[in-house]
Amino acid sequence: MLSYFIPTAKGLAPLLEVELKEMGIENPQQMNGGVKFEGTLEQGYKVCLWSRFASRVLLKLSEFKVLDSMDLYLGCSNIPWETHFDVDKTFSIDFSGTNDEIRNTQFGALKIKDAIVDRFRKHFDERPNVQKRDADIRFNGRLWKDKATIYLDLSGSPLHLRGYRTIAGEAPLRETLAAGIIKRSGWQGEALLDPMCGSGTLVIEAAMMALNIAPGSLRETFGFEKWKKHDQECWQTLKTSAQVYGRRAVNQCETRFYGSDLSKDMIEIARKNAQRAGVGEVIEFSVTDAKKVLPPEELETGMLITNPPYGERLGSFSDTITLYTELGYHFKDAFAGWNLSMFAMDTELLSCLGMRAGKSFKFFNGPIECVLKNYRISPKRPAVEVEPVAPKKTNKETPEPINPWTMGQNESVVEAAIENESELVFKEVQQIKPAIYAEEFANRLLKNLKQLEKWAKREGVECYRLYDADLPEYNVAIDRYAEYIIIQEYRAPKEIETQKVRRRFLDVVSTVRYVLNLPDDKLVIKVRERQKGRQQYEKLDTKKQSLVVHEGQAKMLVNLQDYLDTGLFLDHRPTRLLIGNMAKGKDFLNLFCYTATASVHAALGGAKSTTSVDMSKTYLAWGEDNFAENGIKGKHEFIQQDCIKWLQHAHEMYDLIFIDPPTFSNSKRMNDVFDVQEDHVALLTSASQRLNKQGEIIFSNNKRGFKLDVDAIKALGFYIKDISQSSIPEDFRRNKKIHQCWILTKHTD
């Protein structure tokens, strides 16, 4: 009998052991890094041909004790290498393991190479050549403590290289790992769909299983073909049997397979891979966004299985969280009654799906530890009229979920729920407490909600800040926009470990969803630097989904997805309302107007005219849309220009001017760099020249530590009134340095 060691990726050894038993191999045993067994040459060939989980097939040639490099050399010198390959063939050595004397794998491989070369020279006066890539024959040395084992690699190139994938996408799954994922998913032959299929590996491997295609039958070469003891007749018999008798006819396959991806190029690659694998006729590929893919109409159930991109592939961890959260929403809505198997970088990411998993399995995708979790997506229940259940007082330490989104529908019940921190249960929304739950953060969130909801209801405030890095460990801002919640992650300092930052952010997402009992599609996640003023108008996406929110008598269009900012600066809510009260009968100028929300309030407050100036064409158009949303007509002008440059050439006079400049700006459209601390006097000087007698300027900025040059401003003929404290709304009281604000009134003399 021959001795074999079959290495495999971490997490696949149990599957490999079962697979070997199914091949008729007796007593396979798991060991570190793989499975070993005693068997025939035919069985070694069979593993090369049929194993879906093996990385290589290693035939043991010798095993001996090694205390130092000389022991390794002498032990290898005693192996009859000439009985395994001829001197005119090339060879290569793979070596793994170290001990106290052999501390480098390259050194270990070099000693084996020296022993082989010296033995050939001794017997034939010639030596074979080493070829690291595509060698005729490959050997493997493994050192464990004081024992070395030398193997012949029957597989040659790794067995995950099936032969059908000539082009792969970014960070592709190895075929062996894909097969393991499918096996662990619990798939029983039902329809299978991968909504992010990339180059198609998962769906192709599943189809090959269904058609009983031997994974090794597509390979052109194996490592044993130049081996002197190779039994060609035995190998050809096995290969013919696999090709002729083992494969089921395509027309007999009842299972249907579907693969979709957002990339047209990847789908084209996947189609070609499937054709090469012989499964192209049973797989239907399409170019579709995973968040929009739908099950085939005729299928009421099936298997969703996928490997979504990791944060490194997406570009940011926040993007990954957003993707997983949106996938959870969509899968629960569109694939009710299906099974779902998700392969991901970590358990915390999968918590963003908002589903409770059944079984989970640990794998490694190369060096990255990953997890596979299996879910049953509950079938949709018939729609029923829902009545809230009255809350019951609770003494539990852990706060139960409440539902603030029903405010106004059943106010007494909601108020009681907030007051008692008890559960507001809706039959259609049943939140299960997540595995990841930050209790301290949850308590602070509930405390803020309790304080702010009554205020918001009393003041008619629809959009407000619920949390703003109140606890240093949870460095996020959480805003409510009507029925939506936005979680904005502040970028952590470099000295904080990335893994710790990721874990805390996932704590936040999971806890917010549970505590607020959020409906499935009402959570938006963003990442941003801590703002320095209002300069960070970076575009994030192109969804162009607008939401109408109310502020006083005004209606505002906000965009929760496409930009870091939404179009409405919440901290300046009192300032905008103040402008509405001050603007009646006045000509109003709004510099650095952003989306012209202050101009909307001025117009609705009875301003004679409004002029809104900003460099951004996008935000000015947004401002015009805000005016249209409110049905505002009359003398209202929108000017796209550098505000500082425009002031230098303007001739119109105004009664009320609002100036809320960025902290810093070096836009390409500006001739000079703007710094609010250094340049505010010059800015206010220019603005004062456009001000009528008894006119007023409301000046504000967000620069931390900003110092108004009082003497210079007074010299311009202004009375100065600091309204910073009164201009900070209730929801920003926890951060009283969010902005500073002054009313500058021109002397009458």
Swiss-Prot record:
Residues 43-154 form the THUMP domain. It comes from the Bacteria. InterPro entries: 23SrRNA_methyltr_KL, DNA_methylase_N6_adenine_CS, RlmKL-like_Mtase, RlmKL-like_Mtase_CS, RlmL_1st, SAM-dep_methyl-trfase, SAM-dependent_MTases_sf, THUMP_dom. Disulfide bonds: none annotated. It is found in: Cytoplasm. It catalyses: guanosine(2445) in 23S rRNA + S-adenosyl-L-methionine = N(2)-methylguanosine(2445) in 23S rRNA + S-adenosyl-L-homocysteine + H(+); guanosine(2069) in 23S rRNA + S-adenosyl-L-methionine = N(2)-methylguanosine(2069) in 23S rRNA + S-adenosyl-L-homocysteine + H(+). Pfam families: Methyltrans_SAM, RlmL_1st, THUMP, UPF0020. One of its GO terms (molecular function) is rRNA (guanine-N7-)-methyltransferase activity. Its EC number is 2.1.1.173, 2.1.1.264. Its main location: cytoplasm. SMART domains: THUMP. Residues 386-406 are annotated as: Disordered. Keywords: Cytoplasm, Methyltransferase, RNA-binding, rRNA processing, S-adenosyl-L-methionine, Transferase. GO terms for cellular component: cytoplasm. Belongs to the methyltransferase superfamily. RlmKL family. Specifically methylates the guanine in position 2445 (m2G2445) and the guanine in position 2069 (m7G2069) of 23S rRNA. This is Ribosomal RNA large subunit methyltransferase K/L. The lineage of its organism: Bacteria, Pseudomonadati, Pseudomonadota, Gammaproteobacteria, Alteromonadales.
